[in-house]
């Protein structure tokens, strides 16, 4: 299987890409999410490879792959995964190549400088049939926070898997910008009828942020994956990283303690119902 460098060249014809970037003029991702929702299920070409009912899934804020040992850690626990949700991924780091299997890459750009491009990166053993990028903005810093939305055909099923990789707005005193970023996903969740995974660094460092996320997920019938022992990275005593699922059940779930990032990775095995 060939590795697709989606940040370097256009995707093949089998991959329908809808690139959507909000602007700093106060627009939210709502309109972009509506456009993406309308494209769900529209690409009928068979993708390269199909995902199975049982999936090994990783979610990790890799802190720009800037710390010693990240590649060794990722190689050690990345074997056998079908989906990886990476936040603060750097295009200058060989993240996909570090995982010991060929993976397709779907990148949504976040903070970018002349020397480094970072964002959220979704890796998969199957080529996505749809890829949309949504962008929110940090209200104080004016920097982007990305969400990558991918859709995957499933082996032996008509329905498809919707995978949402989010790095949530962080530096905001109120909830307005955070709420807009989260609620924009409702358009997609209303339209999509198959299984769903939402994973990422949701920056739920306050009770009000966590309550907002919990209420939103409950509204669209998503449930949180529980971790015991819960070794997830915290701020102000609250876990920042989450995995929510719909139309799936959790078989195993663990948090791996690392020193190669300021976030501990989440590794789960999920079964599509």
State each model region's role:
Residues 2-100, 112-117, 183, 273:
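N-terminal, active-site-proximal structural segment of metallo-dependent hydrolase catalytic domains
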Residues 3, 26-45, 151, 187-196, ...:
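Metal-dependent phosphoester-hydrolase catalytic domains
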Residues 29-43, 83, 87-160, 256-257:
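Structured beta-strand-rich core segments of catalytic domains in phosphoester-bond hydrolases
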Residues 41, 53, 117-119, 146-148, ...:
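Residues that flank catalytic or metal-binding motifs in active/ligand-binding sites
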Residues 55-62, 72-96, 162-166, 185-212, ...:
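Active-site beta-strand/loop signature of hydrolases that rely on acidic residues for catalysis
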Residues 132-140, 166-176:
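Surface-exposed cleft-lining segments at the edges of enzyme active sites
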Residues 156, 161-170:
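Active-site-proximal loop/helix segment associated with metal-binding centers of metalloenzymes
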Residues 176-187:
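Alpha-helical scaffold elements lining the catalytic groove of polysaccharide deacetylases
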């Amino acid at each position: 299987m060939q590795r697709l460098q989606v940040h370097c060249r256009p995707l093949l014809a089998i991959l329908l890409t809808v690139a959507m970037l909000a602007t700093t003029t106060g627009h939210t991702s709502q309109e972009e999410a509506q456009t993406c929702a309308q494209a769900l299920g529209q690409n009928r070409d068979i993708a390269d490879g199909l995902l199975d009912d049982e999936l090994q899934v990783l979610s990790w804020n890799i802190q720009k792959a800037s710390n010693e040992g990240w590649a060794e850690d990722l190689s050690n626990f990345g074997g056998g995964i079908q989906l990886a949700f990476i936040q603060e991924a750097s295009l200058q780091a060989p993240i996909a190549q570090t995982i010991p299997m060929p993976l397709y890459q779907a990148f949504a750009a976040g903070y970018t400088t002349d020397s480094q491009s970072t964002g959220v990166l979704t890796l998969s053993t199957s080529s996505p049939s749809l890829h949309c990028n949504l962008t929110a903005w940090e209200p104080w810093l004016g920097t982007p926070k990305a969400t990558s939305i991918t859709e995957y055909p499933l082996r032996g099923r008509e329905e498809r898997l919707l995978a949402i990789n989010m790095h949530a707005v962080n530096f905001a005193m109120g909830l307005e910008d955070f709420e807009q970023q989260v609620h924009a996903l409702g358009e997609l969740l209303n339209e999509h009828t198959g299984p769903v995974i939402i994973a990422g660094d949701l920056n739920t460092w306050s009770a009000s942020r966590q309550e907002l996320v919990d209420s939103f997920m409950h509204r669209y019938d998503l449930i949180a994956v529980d971790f015991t022992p819960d070794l997830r990275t915290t701020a102000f005593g609250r876990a920042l990283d989450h995995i929510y699922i719909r139309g799936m059940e959790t078989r195993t779930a663990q948090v791996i303690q690392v020193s190669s990032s300021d976030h501990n990775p989440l590794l789960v095995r999920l079964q599509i119902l």
